[in-house]
């Protein structure tokens, strides 16, 4: 579960290393997000010379969640960390590489470019 103030690792090479969730998009009463949800976040740490800078407000899609996600067959998929990929307004990733595995549930939400860049889809 991702909510406001949650710190997430950035799983791409956009220049940000860590972001903090400001808002989960999808309605005024929405409190939590999970894998495949779009969030608004603030960059808390970044690498020098990257595309994004510290303090910048960005949109991101959650690709890994420690809470886990229940699949249709009854199984659960969960990860060791919370991670996100920074995206543009047209749902395309800002970076050119994705690090670590991502869940296949992103395909249902039309993040096919992220799936094609990922080294492993679980």
UniProtKB/Swiss-Prot annotation:
Family annotation (CDD domains): Ribosomal_uL14
SMART domains: Ribosomal_L14
Domain of life, per lineage: Bacteria
One GO process term, biological-process aspect: translation
Annotated InterPro entries: Ribosomal_uL14, Ribosomal_uL14_bac-type, Ribosomal_uL14_CS, Ribosomal_uL14_sf
Oxidoreductase recorded as keyword: no
Keywords associated with the record: Ribonucleoprotein, Ribosomal protein, RNA-binding, rRNA-binding
One function term, GO molecular function aspect: structural constituent of ribosome
Pfam families assigned: Ribosomal_L14
Cellular component GO terms held in the UniProt record: cytosolic large ribosomal subunit
Similarity annotation: Belongs to the universal ribosomal protein uL14 family.
Function per UniProt: Binds to 23S rRNA. Forms part of two intersubunit bridges in the 70S ribosome.
Quaternary structure note: Part of the 50S ribosomal subunit. Forms a cluster with proteins L3 and L19. In the 70S ribosome, L14 and L19 interact and together make contacts with the 16S rRNA in bridges B5 and B8.
Name recorded for this polypeptide: Large ribosomal subunit protein uL14
Species of provenance: Clostridium acetobutylicum (strain ATCC 824 / DSM 792 / JCM 1419 / IAM 19013 / LMG 5710 / NBRC 13948 / NRRL B-527 / VKM B-1787 / 2291 / W)
Gene that encodes the chain: rplN
